[in-house]
Design a protein with these regions (language model features):
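C-terminal "post-core" interaction segments
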Residues: 1-200
């Protein structure tokens, strides 16, 4: 919905923020990655029973308006699991620039198993690798541009304080006056500067 709204506007670039994102569903990571990757691999899975699976971009999900604009993905040491699938897919397919810190390094794919008591337990069933075959487990994904992570409270405050209009204002401002907390959030500021410079 957000990308559809953006497609009707003239934009300079896109910034995705998965800092402090512990992950989520594998299918969701694949869906989101496919919105930015026209063709190519998203992730490969190696199951503990010895089988392998290569998951490609889903046809029809790609947004054509993203083709010629810079895309930035903000990451930090708390970006894990499904958010790392997105990071690995965007990095290996060379469609986005990663800014921030090396990610957490959790490459386990888990699924729930029902217990006879009525509860459930989540157990790992596979390990995932990036499109280029990189094993990021306990290693993480290094950003293209490394920027020290600001305090978590600053990141949280920034995310809850900046509206869409204010973020756009940050892109086009010609003054040195800080806009909200952007100047304190070095990773976000670096991403904005990168977009303004045309992705250079």
């Amino acid at each position: 919905e957000a990308l559809e709204k953006l497609s009707k506007q003239t934009i300079e670039g896109v910034i995705l923020d998965v800092r402090n994102n512990p992950g989520g569903l594998l299918n969701t990571a694949i869906d989101i990655s496919s919105m930015f990757i026209k063709t190519g691999k998203i992730v490969s899975l190696r199951y503990y029973d010895g089988t392998k699976e290569i998951i490609p971009s889903i046809p029809g999900y790609y947004n054509n308006f993203l083709e010629n604009i810079p895309i930035v993905l903000l990451v930090n040491t708390a970006s894990a699991s499904a958010s790392e699938i997105l990071a690995g897919a965007l990095k290996d397919n060379e469609v986005a620039t990663l800014i921030g810190e090396t990610t957490y390094g959790k490459a386990a794919v888990q699924r729930p198993f029902q217990l006879s008591t009525g509860g459930e337990i989540w157990l790992p069933i596979a390990r995932y690798f990036t499109p280029n075959g990189t094993d990021i487990n306990l290693k993480g994904i290094a950003p293209h541009i490394e920027v020290k992570n600001p305090p978590k409270e600053v990141v949280s405050l920034t995310l809850t304080s900046i509206s869409e209009e204010e973020a756009q204002q940050a892109l086009y401002t010609t003054t040195d006056k800080p806009i909200l907390h952007i100047e304190e959030d070095l990773q976000l500021k670096t991403a904005l500067d990168f977009i303004v410079s045309g992705g250079k």
